[in-house]
Every structure is written in structure tokens, then in C-alpha cells.
Regions:
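Flexible helix-coil transition and linker loops at the boundaries of alpha-helical arrays
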Residues: 67-69, 81-86, 186-190, 224-234, ...
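Residue-level recognition of tetratricopeptide repeat
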Residues: 10, 44, 99, 133-134, ...
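Position-specific recognition of the canonical hydrophobic site in helix A of tetratricopeptide repeat
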Residues: 13, 47, 102, 136-137, ...
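Single-residue signature of alpha-solenoid repeat helices
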Residues: 21, 54, 76, 110, ...
Length: 354
């Protein structure tokens, strides 16, 4: 691995053994075990040791593929600064240096380095993406961040991650659901590459009242677990079905509402996660009871409403996806009203307003 060559060669550099270090990096190049930093380190080493070949090494560094290159060592700062001095037209050296500074929370230095890189090469999408995130997160420059992220996406409309990040910026600046949905749906091939983009489209469909489309899209996609996504897919799965069930109840199609609500109680495999112990299902059972009531099946309706009053009764902040949600208490109250237990129902409602 390139890192092993770097470790030993940098030890040689620390001892002032520039020729030996350069020899080791040349072995790495011969073996094909390289990253762009291999060439930057070699160029810096040759410069420090006043050896020949530094100019060629730094030229090779500037042309090397930048994919997955994330310098993180303190020595990398010296090597990249050397490259910026010796080869001032190299746009990648300040880009890598900005990445390193940002990782070390030196945000002003990172922005300065990235801006230098952008001036040297304004056709590199990632530099605009990085500048967008830094301006939004560290400078609160919303308009500039969006301008830069849009530029990054225009430069490479095959990058699904940048599409996702651009949409997230639109969400943060409160673009309308309809506008965001129309934008995303221009790129179905990119959406299909990422579960989070598929979920975002489904969420926007639900938020714009397109429940049937949301349900169809969600049911056709196989999701995979990802950190930070816990509970989001089942949430939209259930939301679409509850809203469709409510529409069926309003139209008097009670038998149509029941299977939709029953589906909310089961998590099919394609959601990518299972139902947690103690999941609150008050609203599902409340509406199911209403459907059975509409069909004249009062016993089944009462059974559903009894299920709907089960669960925590004290409102609390829902900080995590698996925390008890206070709005479920509202449906407990509605179910208690249906059961004729007025005092208990008012007690639930009072807790939500006191």
C-alpha cells in the first residue's frame, strides 16, 4: 500500500536522508503503489535535498487522478506548500491542502486554499462542491453556497451525490416541496443510484399529496440500511398508507382503508429495517377502528380502539427516531372518545396543551 512507502520514506526525510527517501518513493512508483501524494512527497523530498527530478515529480503530481486522495499528515502540508511554490499553476495542490486544512478545522485556511484552486481550474466540480459546503456551514453564506453547488452539478451532471447535496441545500433554504420535486425528477437515473435520493423523492411526493405515487415508488425499491436513515423509510411507507386510508374513509370506502392500515403494522423486507419493540401504532388502530365502524362492525371497531389507547401517555421530546412521539397521544384521546371515555380522553388532550 502507498501509505507504507510514505511512512518509511518520511522517516528517512526526518533523518535528512533525502536520497534514500526519494529512492523508496521511486520504488513505489515502479510498483504502481501510488497516490498523488507519492509524487508530491517525492517532489518535496528532491527539492529539500537539492536533487534533480523535482520539477517532473511535481508535474506528475498535478496530473495524477485525484480520486480518493485525502492527505492527512502534517508532512503533507509541507509537500503541498512546496508544490504551490514550485509549480504555481497546479490547481490540485491547493485543493488537497484545503481538504487537509478543513479536516483539521482550519476553515479559513481551507477556504483560502480552495479559492486558489478554483481560480487555477474552474472546471473541477469538487472544488465548487467543497466551497459550497464550507460557505454554508462555516460562513452562513446561503446564496453563495447554492451558486457554488449548482455550478458543481452543472460541471458534472452524472454525480448523484452532488445532486443529493444540492437538494439538501434547497431544503435548508426552504425551497418549496413542489419546486424541489420538479428539480429532482429531471434526473431519474441519478435518483435510482442512491437510497437517500429515492427516499427524498418519496417524501416530497407525500408532502405534495401524491400519496399513490409515493406508495408505488416506495414499494418498488429495495432499500439498504444507512447510518442516519433509521426510521425514515418506514415513516414514509406508513405515511403514504395512512393518508390513502384517510381519503378512503372520507369517500366511504371503508373496506379499502383497512388493508392499507394493516400494512402499516408490518415492515416488508424491502424497507431495509424491521419494526422495533414497543413501536407506537395508535393512529393506525384508531383509523382502522373508524373503518370497521363504517362497515357496521362495532365489535372489531372497539377492539381496534382499545389497541389505539395503549402506549406512553406523557408527552416528551422525541430526540431520536425510536423515541415515543407525542402526537400518538392525540390518537389515544380520539380512540377514548370513540369508546365513550370522555374524562380519560380529555386527560390525554390536556397533557398535550398544558
Amino acid at each position: 500500500l502507498p501509505i507504507y512507502y510514505d511512512e518509511i520514506a518520511l522517516d528517512y526525510c526526518s533523518a535528512g536522508c533525502w536520497s534514500e527517501a526519494a529512492g523508496l518513493w521511486n520504488v513505489a512508483i515502479t510498483e504502481g503503489s501510488v497516490t498523488p501524494m507519492t509524487y508530491y512527497y517525492l517532489g518535496w523530498c528532491l527539492t529539500q535535498g537539492k536533487l534533480s527530478g523535482a520539477e517532473q515529480a511535481l508535474a506528475d503530481a498535478a496530473q495524477a487522478c485525484s480520486d480518493y486522495c485525502f492527505p492527512n499528515r502534517l508532512e503533507a502540508i509541507l509537500a503541498l506548500q512546496c508544490a504551490m511554490e514550485q509549480n504555481p499553476n497546479d490547481a490540485k495542490a491547493p485543493y488537497y491542502l484545503g481538504n487537509l486544512y478543513y479536516d483539521k478545522r482550519q476553515y479559513d485556511l481551507a477556504l483560502e486554499a480552495w479559492e486558489t484552486s478554483a481560480k487555477l481550474d474552474d472546471k473541477f466540480p469538487t472544488i465548487w462542491r467543497n466551497l459550497a459546503l464550507a460557505n454554508f456551514n462555516k460562513k452562513n453564506e446561503e446564496a453563495r453556497a447554492i451558486e457554488y453547488m449548482e455550478r458543481a452539478f452543472r460541471l458534472d451532471k452524472t454525480d448523484a451525490r452532488v445532486l443529493m447535496e444540492l437538494d439538501q441545500l434547497y431544503k435548508r433554504v426552504r425551497r418549496s416541496h413542489a419546486e424541489r420535486l420538479a428539480f429532482l425528477q429531471q434526473y431519474p437515473e441519478l435518483i435510482a443510484q442512491r437510497d437517500d435520493l429515492v427516499l427524498e423523492e418519496i417524501t416530497l411526493l407525500n408532502q405534495t399529496g401524491e400519496y399513490e405515487k409515493a406508495k408505488t415508488l416506495l414499494d418498488a425499491h429495495i432499500f439498504h440500511p444507512w447510518e442516519g436513515g433509521e426510521g425514515k423509510v418506514p415513516g414514509q411507507y406508513q405515511f403514504a398508507r395512512v393518508e390513502l386510508a384517510k381519503k378512503a374513509l372520507e369517500a366511504g370506502n371503508y373496506s379499502q382503508a383497512i388493508p392499507l392500515l394493516e400494512e402499516c403494522l408490518e415492515y416488508p423486507h424491502h424497507l431495509g429495517e424491521g419494526k422495533l419493540y414497543g413501536a407506537q401504532e395508535n393512529d393506525f388502530y384508531y383509523f382502522m377502528g373508524c373503518a370497521y365502524e363504517g362497515l357496521g362492525q362495532s365489535d372489531k371497531a372497539a377492539e381496534c380502539w382499545e389497541q389505539a389507547i395503549v402506549g406512553p401517555t406523557e408527552p416528551a421530546a422525541a430526540m431520536y427516531y425510536n423515541d415515543a412521539k407525542p402526537d400518538k397521544i392525540f390518537y389515544q384521546g380520539l380512540a377514548l372518545l370513540k369508546l365513550g371515555r370522555m374524562d380519560e380522553a380529555n386527560g390525554r388532550f390536556h397533557k398535550l396543551t398544558s
